[in-house]
């Protein structure tokens, strides 16, 4: 049997790490060193009407290419997620004050999460997949928001929506439409199918 290709996850996301680990994939972690905000701003300048799903895919591609160039013999898995509300693209909050602002803007509103995953080898992206989910936060009280921020802590700043749906953040929601893994940040079923096709997992 041929030796399986070494797999690298180009992400420092604990959630993505845990999803792949739970699925039985052997891999190492090498977070991509790219300036995401600079890329986002450049994309916005080039095309004000760019689709948020396309932004997620382009960022996932950039991460995959960056790590693959430094690890040409490995199979790289990279991902990105964007959040859009009425045409506005959100970034991860820098602190709890920004997290509060994000949640107040999303409160009672329907928004979209767009999650992209890319596979790269030898410096080139060879496969991508993008999925979207539609979510709506309930019209929670300020008292609940204050309590949530206190209990959830700085960890929510790792989520573009300032919520972690797999934890306490689930209580923020009124409606969720979409794949659970996509919402967490990695479309697992399409990714696992592609890894099996490539021989990185047993078919």
Sequence positions of predicted segments:
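N-terminal beta1-alpha1 ligand-phosphate binding loop
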Residues: 2-25
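N-terminal beta-loop-helix "entrance" segment that forms/cooperates
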Residues: 38-48
């Amino acid at each position: 049997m041929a030796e399986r290709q070494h797999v690298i996850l180009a992400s420092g996301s604990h959630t993505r790490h845990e999803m792949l680990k739970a699925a039985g994939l052997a891999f190492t972690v090498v977070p991509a060193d790219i300036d995401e905000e600079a890329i986002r701003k450049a994309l916005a300048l080039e095309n004000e009407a760019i689709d948020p799903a396309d932004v997620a895919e382009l960022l996932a591609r950039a991460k995959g290419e960056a790590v693959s160039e430094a690890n040409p013999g490995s199979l790289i898995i990279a991902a990105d997620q964007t959040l859009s509300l009425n045409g506005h693209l959100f970034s991860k909050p820098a602190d709890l004050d920004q997290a509060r602002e994000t949640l107040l803007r999303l409160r009672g509103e329907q928004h979209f999460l767009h999650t992209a995953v890319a596979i790269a080898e030898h410096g080139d992206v060879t496969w991508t997949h993008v999925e979207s989910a539609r979510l709506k936060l309930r019209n929670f009280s300020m008292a609940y928001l204050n309590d949530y921020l206190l209990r959830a802590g700085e960890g929510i700043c790792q989520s573009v929506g300032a919520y972690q749906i797999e934890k306490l953040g689930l209580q923020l929601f009124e409606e969720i439409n979409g794949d659970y893994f996509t919402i967490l940040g990695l479309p697992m079923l399409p990714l696992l199918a592609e890894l099996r096709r490539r021989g990185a997992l047993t078919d």
